[in-house]
Curated annotation (Swiss-Prot):
It comes from the Bacteria. One of its GO terms (cellular component) is plasma membrane. It comes from Bradyrhizobium sp. (strain BTAi1 / ATCC BAA-1182). Belongs to the UppP family. HAMAP family: Undec_diphosphatase. InterPro entries: UppP. One of its GO terms (molecular function) is undecaprenyl-diphosphatase activity. Keywords: Antibiotic resistance, Cell inner membrane, Cell membrane, Cell shape, Cell wall biogenesis/degradation, Hydrolase, Membrane, Peptidoglycan synthesis, Transmembrane, Transmembrane helix. This is Undecaprenyl-diphosphatase. Its EC number is 3.6.1.27. Catalyzes the dephosphorylation of undecaprenyl diphosphate (UPP). Confers resistance to bacitracin.
Length: 268
């Protein structure tokens, strides 16, 4: 039987690797739970949300100077203030939909079959967007038009369906709205900060009574592992998509989703 420490490490790796790639971290965690017995009880389901903070802090660390410049500049620079407003505008749709329908979405759609179909459909869309001849007009994620931020935020709501991918939905939306591949990926990272911090705070509040000192130790392990893994993955990801696009990730989604459907059909 797998030890809790090893389980925490494996889930931390899955979270750190998949959170900022357009492949759906939630989908991969649900499939890991279904096929490998990772995270089957209440604590481990909350664990998957709690360790997202490690991945988020990796983004804060990687973009610390840029984010600090924007935060300080917002006091005197209209463009920096507009970017902060843009992130909040993009964040708002997820807050509204999450509060209204989050409980029902989890009850109805958090299912391995839904994950697999979402992975395949999302992979096909990502492949299509990567291959069509888009003409990027926006090359700086901190200078997108405000309406563009809003539509990216609306697209992010699709990621409440497990398997869709928060980063995938926001990257595709940004590219279709005129962003280049690198800036689309970067804004997806920036938008993840309030979105995932909000999810962390909400889930921690709900599960605080169930937490023991042992649980906190496991969360700390998963947190550190997801932080380190995300740091490595994000740096490599930006360089890769700038040169090669998203084809690799699109096919990964299709393959994982197809294998998952086969396994489910066979009763695995």
């Amino acid at each position: 039987m797998m030890s809790d420490t090893l389980r925490a490490v494996l889930l931390g790796i899955i979270e750190g690797v998949t959170e900022f790639l357009p492949v759906s971290s939630t989908g991969h965690l649900l499939l890991a739970e279904r096929f490998f017995g990772l995270g089957e009880d209440g604590f481990w389901k909350s664990f998957a949300i709690l360790i997202q903070l490690g991945a988020i802090l990796a983004i804060v660390a990687l973009y610390f100077f840029k984010l600090s410049r924007v935060a300080i500049g917002a006091l005197s620079n209209a463009d920096d203030r507009r970017f902060i407003i843009g992130v909040l505008i993009a964040f708002l749709p997820a807050v509204i939909i999450g509060l209204i329908a989050g409980k029902y979405i989890k009850a109805l759609l958090f299912d391995p079959w839904v994950v697999c179909f979402s992975l395949i459909v999302g992979g096909a869309i990502l492949l299509w967007v990567d291959q069509i001849d888009l003409k990027p007009r926006e090359h700086d994620a901190t200078r997108y038009p405000l309406l563009m931020y809003l539509w990216i935020g609306v697209a992010q709501c699709l990621a409440m369906i497990p398997g869709v991918s928060r980063s995938g939905a926001t990257i595709v939306a940004a590219m279709l709205l005129g962003g280049d591949k690198r800036s689309a990926a970067e804004f997806s990272f920036f938008l993840a900060i309030p979105t995932m911090v909000g999810a962390f705070v909400y889930d921690f509040y709900k599960s605080r009574a169930e937490m023991t000192s042992d649980h906190l130790g496991l969360v700390a392990i998963g947190f550190v592992v997801s932080f380190i893994t995300a740091m490595i993955v994000v740096k490599a990801f930006l360089g890769y998509v700038t040169r090669h696009g998203f084809v690799l990730f699109a096919w990964w989604r299709v393959i994982v989703g197809t294998l998952g459907l086969i396994a489910l059909a066979l009763g695995k």
